[in-house]
């Protein structure tokens, strides 16, 4: 069936199918990017070492946006004992889909004694976009990972609202077959949950931060909670989830402005990095540009 906004004479552009495979391994005193394979417009910049032996890499998507029918597949493995920091240089824009779904699938695998910081910029969902964003994180015993995702519903800079479309957010965090946390969310632009007090309460920026590792304790969650804001415009909360052999902290942020939500997540990452990774936090140079 033709989308109602799509003229019959218009040819739907070809979709991008892009993949990126990265592997990091410890080589002597530092972590090296030992494998990089890509197909389509997903690339990684030359690794940098602003923190000694910790490998920093920036993932690039030159089109800068994801249109209907596009699919991005990112697979990252951090081998035993290695430490990688991954980021993106700018927001991922989810364009008007013309009735077709766009998707990004991320799989992160962290080995025993390995550490990962997954710090992408936010996702901006344009009006009439249909976006599916999934993340699977597998952390081996003794490994640790801190990461986040943020979504902005509508283009705040231009005043555009998100009035049509759909968003799927699927996340799984665990160790092998044992899951610590599974979430499958489906939000329609016209859903009453967007304005319900028990839902988004009219706010349009959602942030989630997870921290997995032996240091993810209830005491740490309580200490972090004391620093979090809770106002009509910016709300954050944290909880500790644990199973035999693994634990994690889950931080939720809901706000009206991306900048405010970003500050909460960055401040939380800085507070968590030492207890989770055993490494002091240093803000990424990328954030200052």
Curated annotation (Swiss-Prot):
Disulfide bonds: none annotated. Signal peptide: none annotated. One of its GO terms (molecular function) is nickel cation binding. The keyword rRNA-binding does not apply. Required for maturation of urease via the functional incorporation of the urease nickel metallocenter. HAMAP family: UreD. This is Urease accessory protein UreD. It comes from Cupriavidus necator (strain ATCC 17699 / DSM 428 / KCTC 22496 / NCIMB 10442 / H16 / Stanier 337) (Ralstonia eutropha).
């Amino acid at each position: 069936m033709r989308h109602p906004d799509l003229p019959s004479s218009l040819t739907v552009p070809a979709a991008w199918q892009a993949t990126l495979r990265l592997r990091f391994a410890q080589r002597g005193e530092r972590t090296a990017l030992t494998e990089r394979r890509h197909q389509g417009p997903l690339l990684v910049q030359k690794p940098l070492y602003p923190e000694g032996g910790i490998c920093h890499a920036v993932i690039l998507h030159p089109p800068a946006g994801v249109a209907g029918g596009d699919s991005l597949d990112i697979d990252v493995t951090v081998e035993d004992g290695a430490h990688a920091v991954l980021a993106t240089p700018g927001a991922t824009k989810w364009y008007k889909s013309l009735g077709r779904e766009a998707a990004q699938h991320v799989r992160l695998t962290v080995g025993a004694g390995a550490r990962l910081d997954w710090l992408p910029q936010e996702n901006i969902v344009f009006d009439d976009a249909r976006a599916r964003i999934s993340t699977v994180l597998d952390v081996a015993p003794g490994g640790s990972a801190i990461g986040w995702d943020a979504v902005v519903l509508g283009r705040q800079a231009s005043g555009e609202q998100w009035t049509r479309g759909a968003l799927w957010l699927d996340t799984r965090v665990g160790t092998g077959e044992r899951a610590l946390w599974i979430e499958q969310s489906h939000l329609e632009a016209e859903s009453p949950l967007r304005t319900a007090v028990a839902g988004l309460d009219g706010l349009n920026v959602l942030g989630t931060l997870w921290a997995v590792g032996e240091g993810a304790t209830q005491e740490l969650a309580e200490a972090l909670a004391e620093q979090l804001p809770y106002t009509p415009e910016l709300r954050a909360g944290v909880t500790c989830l644990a199973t035999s052999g693994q634990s994690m902290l889950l931080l939720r942020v809901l706000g009206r402005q991306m900048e405010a939500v970003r500050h909460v997540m960055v401040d939380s990452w800085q507070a968590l990095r030492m207890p989770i990774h055993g490494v002091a936090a240093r803000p990424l140079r990328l954030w200052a540009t």
